[in-house]
Amino acid sequence: MNTIDKKQSLGGFEKYLPLWIPLCMAIGVLLSLYTTLGERIEALAIGGISIPIGICLFFMMYPAVLNLKGSELRKLKDNPQPILLTLFSNWIIAPLVGFVLAKMFLSDHDELFVAVILLSASPCTAMVLVWGSMADGNQEQNVVNTSLNTITIMIFYAPLVALLTGIQNIEIDRWGLAISVLVFIGLPILAGLLTRKIVIPMKGETWFDETYRPVLGKFSIISLLTTLIVLFALNGNTILGSPEYLLLISIPLLLGFVIVVGINIAMTKLFRLKYREAAVTVIIGSSSHFEIAIATAIAAYGVGSVAALGTTMGLFWEIPIMLGLVYLTRYLGRKNFW
């Protein structure tokens, strides 16, 4: 098994995300019981969009799109097979598996059904750079795939979500869905491109990659955890009154992950990918962009909705599961599976 020269790892704070996430959920529930934070946040809104949540969502998304490098897309022609397999998994396999499982377990719970679709139809563009590096995967392929995901999510996400929810006869504001994608992905992409255009000529690409992006990455995680606290502060009564919602959505999410990972491992074996390419394909093809799923759920159903609450469970499970997947791919690599 080959390794890359410079391997990324989670920082001290990020290593404990599996602890911070449930802690923030608990803090949010306690705040809902003993304070009026939820009501005050709901009052800070313009046109139905919560200003504090909007700020948090922007800083969740903005650091991720700083990874977008148009120049990297030219490398697609060098070794297209693993990249195309990853796109196939992201846009065909994962959404279909999510739809089937949501139909099996959540047919009577429209907002939870939508939450599963929002998660399964959103390929990751940020954390997979770290997961792929920790697995000693091909980082050039990783950057190309995340750049492609950033672009394709602008094109395919809203139509795919509308299609899959429409098959289930769930009414969703399609224009609102498209607008939320433009706002919560389009604006951060624009800001990211402008940042690269302005900052790199001034400070250099090394400073941008090694100093600026890591600092913004901290803002992303803090914004993510703040959003969790707010969401659970607004949904505390719902959670305590109906804790089965969290269990209900966890079943298709966990089953879906196992199925999609299994398909991706089999697919990379079938197409005889080498370890470094297979690891990245499995990791990216099996991950979700929980930030855009949360943002879209809030835009479509409101900050205090069951749909928004449901998408947070994608985040709850994603971090520990992806860490486990890193260890699984490394184990398979040591056993010369690929």
Feature annotation, model-predicted:
Residues 1-66, 71-286, 290-338:
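Alpha-helical transmembrane segments of multi-pass small-molecule/ion transporters
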